[in-house]
Amino acid sequence: MIPEKRIIRRIQSGGCAIHCQDCSISQLCIPFTLNEHELDQLDNIIERKKPIQKGQTLFKAGDELKSLYAIRSGTIKSYTITEQGDEQITGFHLAGDLVGFDAIGSGHHPSFAQALETSMVCKIPFETLDDLSGKMPNLRQQMMRLMSGEIKGDQDMILLLSKKNAEERLAAFIYNLSRRFAQRGFSPREFRLTMTRGDIGNYLGLTVETISRLLGRFQKSGMLAVKGKYITIENSDALAALAGHTRNVA
């Protein structure tokens, strides 16, 4: 039976909100490891925003850190603007990811966050979350796990760009994306790229032409099937090997 206070919150939000207790990707997000009482406390501080449309921004570089954003659905890209005025993509965030961690140190966002497709996010006031985590060890631990995961991702990206050639970079990108989809309960073998080839090239330090040529090469070798933005992994062992991994896509 659904507790009365949760029903009231649903009525107040128009009956369309998905709360932490019911969210399908909560195991990837802040609620993981929290008990029911802790979940209720967290739920009370979260604002469920209306859908964010493609091209809209969650925050801009230089904005004061007021909230973190947990992605419920869709894809958000983070990027900075170089001194030359060029966009440099620093990450692609999927459902279950938390966006805005990199602003905690200075109190201001060093990057932009923009929706690549219609997305749903939970807005979490940072000061309130920080205060709550001081009272809830499980919440504090989970925040540290999420931040650790982001640091590890940054380290992997540095290694990717410094050690791998163009083929290996793209293979690693597709392989890692498939693993992330699998963690979220989606097919790791068949998926749609929400980012453009230009975005992928920008992120990997490659040209659009190189991305297109490599995708064609991967398809010709039987490793992938490519149809527009849709990718099917035909030979997961070959992809994993080229990406520098030995485990199968599962």
Swiss-Prot record:
Region (Activating region 3D): 112
Region (Activating region 1A): 71-75
DNA-binding region listed in the record: 197-216
Region annotation (Essential for the oxygen-regulated activity) ranges: 20-29
Cofactor(s) required, per the database record: [4Fe-4S] cluster
Keyword Iron attached: yes
SUPFAM superfamilies: cAMP-binding domain-like (SSF51206), Winged helix' DNA-binding domain (SSF46785)
Region (Activating region 1B): 116-121
First-listed, main subcellular location of the protein, grouped into a coarse class: cytoplasm
Role: Global transcription factor that controls the expression of over 100 target genes in response to anoxia. It facilitates the adaptation to anaerobic growth conditions by regulating the expression of gene products that are involved in anaerobic energy metabolism. When the terminal electron acceptor, O(2), is no longer available, it represses the synthesis of enzymes involved in aerobic respiration and increases the synthesis of enzymes required for anaerobic respiration.
Protein name: Fumarate and nitrate reduction regulatory protein
Native source organism of the sequence: Salmonella typhi
Highest classification ranks of the organism: Bacteria, Pseudomonadati, Pseudomonadota, Gammaproteobacteria, Enterobacterales
Gene: fnr
